[in-house]
Amino acid sequence: MAKSVATERALAGKGLVDIYPFKSLGEGLSSPDEIVLVDVGGGQGQVLEDMRMHVLELNGKKMVLEDLPKTVEDHVPLEDVDFVPYDFLTVEQPVKGARAYLLRHILHDWPDRICRKILLNTIPALVKGKSKILIVEIILPPVNPPIFGALMDIQMMNYGGGGRKERQWRAIFESVGLEIVKIWPTAKSDSVMELVLKSS
């Protein structure tokens, strides 16, 4: 199971770097110690490793991977990546002021109230005008969802989560003081939703 998840995450990482302008995270840094990206629940780091390989602007820049202690203990070291034990359900985000916080396929596992809790644990780390949250999830269309999205929705309903339409995602984000800047659809079913703190 862990191996299949790792493979899926690696393939997804390749899709992400082709769609979202991650190179912008490595530009105009105020300090060489500034953290450009935090991968929340990032497993063994397949997505970050792919970014290091394909986004030249991130080479030599500091990134952080967070996951549960057992996962972090078993990690293979990655250059320029710090591994930090973190439970996004119970603890406030410990890495403050990063350029971006990546939550990929995290929120679909949980009902709305837990999604809000995860986001509220992340928000204190954001610096207004600098930090953003990148949510990678399936956005179901208003009608006739693709078969993969529909199957995922049915599967996750057993756990209280599931796929959501754009208006449902927006409602969750706005309820905790976040707003969508832009949605970046990938070639597959996922979309990257770029969030920032509300301007007012």
Region spans (language model):
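Conserved adenosyl
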Residues: M1-P145, I180-V181, P185, S191
